[in-house]
Regions:
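Structural and coupling elements of P-loop NTPases
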Residues: 1-198
Length: 198
């Protein structure tokens, strides 16, 4: 991993329908909500609300970045009471964007509230309902539940070289809830992979 940091990234642009809360996503990552694609953007974050889907202008913006090979990632807002969920949004984005990878899945509490994530790389869980978030290794039952998802993810990653995200050829989808902080650290890890402009 390079020694660059999130602070070295000059321009983080956020795109997406207003229902996906792009303003709060921008605030979480020091970005700017935009409606224009261009080569001056260091990374493009596309915010998606599973309940609203993906509108035409957002799809066109995604495609506009192809010529610049801009690093792009998708953040999917996961909140209480949503009928559509992270998996639904990823399926839709896979059809209208480029194929995405899902390095983390959402974990729900007993009331159905999204409270955590599981890494498909190392099977580490993060519980964001605690302060600070609690990390642990998934139990055997959870590992069995995510087994097929993990195999698919690892197969996708075999084809990718280190730096694929920064090169603009790997497109991660990350669940995010700015209310409880779910996924914010995961997005920041990807942003830290980006080189500075210096």
């Amino acid at each position: 991993m390079s020694s660059t940091s999130r602070d070295a990234v000059k321009s983080v642009n956020i795109y997406g329908h207003i229902s996906a809360l792009p303003e709060s996503i921008a605030a979480a990552f020091g970005g700017t909500v935009s409606t224009i694609a261009g080569p001056e953007c260091d990374v493009a974050i596309f915010a998606i609300n599973p309940a609203a889907g993906i509108d035409g202008p957002t799809i066109e913006l995604w495609k506009s970045f192809d010529e610049f090979q801009t690093p792009r990632l998708v953040v999917i807002t996961v909140m209480d009471g949503m009928e559509m969920d992270f998996d639904d949004a990823v399926l839709l984005a896979n059809r209208v964007f480029d194929p995405l990878v899902t390095p983390h899945l959402v974990l729900h509490g007993e009331a159905g509230t999204p409270i955590g994530t599981i890494s498909l790389n190392d099977l580490t869980t993060t519980d964001y309902s605690t302060n600070p978030p609690t990390r642990s290794t998934a139990d055997d039952e959870l590992q069995e539940i995510v087994k097929d998802f993990r195999e698919e993810f690892l197969d996708q990653m075999v084809e990718m070289e280190e730096g694929a995200f920064a090169a603009g050829i790997l497109f991660p989808a990350i669940p995010v809830n700015t209310g409880n902080g779910l996924g914010i650290d995961l997005v920041k890890e990807f942003l830290a992979e980006l080189p500075s402009r210096s």
